[in-house]
Amino acid sequence: MDDVTKALNLVPMVVEQTSRGERAYDIYSRLLKERLIFLVGPIDDYMANLIVAQLLFLEAENPEKDINIYINSPGGVVTAGMAIYDTMQYIKPAVSTICVGQAASMGALLLASGASGKRYALPNSRVMIHQPLGGFQGQATDIDIHAREILALRARLNEILAKHTGQSLETIAHDTERDNFKSAVDAQAYGLVDQVFGQRQEELIQSS
């Protein structure tokens, strides 16, 4: 039994009383009804497809009501993360982001790209930014092509972080040279999140 199957077997079910009797949901489906999305684990194409589908579904249900994404991710594939980022920016509802545990690499970029004033972190969460990683073997010309692609991705990611944090491109480029870990408070000071809180905020309850 692989790790994914084991995890699915541990997902609790919630029973809800409706006018037609009892209805059982897995916990994530029930929370999706409350416009809560969970981005947990490495970001790959499969994860991106799930998140994008949920964002589009919630927009179709109510384009005026906020969506909340809880992030606990070590990062992952840049193109998969960019698919989520572009969808967050594209849809009409404001997307609030909340860091629980960690938001590293692409996870940090998605955390920072939430709606202005609606980006949160819990007090013991960690945020890490860095430049994209890459490794390629092959002919020299192919290696050169991939190296230029990594540099282009790095420039684009730096632009996005600068846009959402208010930091200069030069500062972002310098600060992402190596793994740069930040506490929740430091992430707020840097502009990656807007607020750190230890208790649920009234405005977050109302927005969900």
UniProtKB/Swiss-Prot annotation:
It is an enzyme of class 3 (hydrolase). HAMAP family: ClpP. This is ATP-dependent Clp protease proteolytic subunit. It comes from Xylella fastidiosa (strain Temecula1 / ATCC 700964). Belongs to the peptidase S14 family. The active site is at S105 (nucleophile), H130. One of its GO terms (molecular function) is ATPase binding. It is found in: Cytoplasm. Its main location: cytoplasm. Cleaves peptides in various proteins in a process that requires ATP hydrolysis. Has a chymotrypsin-like activity. Plays a major role in the degradation of misfolded proteins. InterPro entries: ClpP (IPR001907), ClpP/crotonase-like_dom_sf (IPR029045), ClpP/TepA (IPR023562), ClpP_His_AS (IPR033135), ClpP_Ser_AS (IPR018215). CDD domains: S14_ClpP_2. The lineage of its organism: Bacteria, Pseudomonadati, Pseudomonadota, Gammaproteobacteria, Lysobacterales. Keywords: Cytoplasm, Hydrolase, Protease, Serine protease. Its EC number is 3.4.21.92.
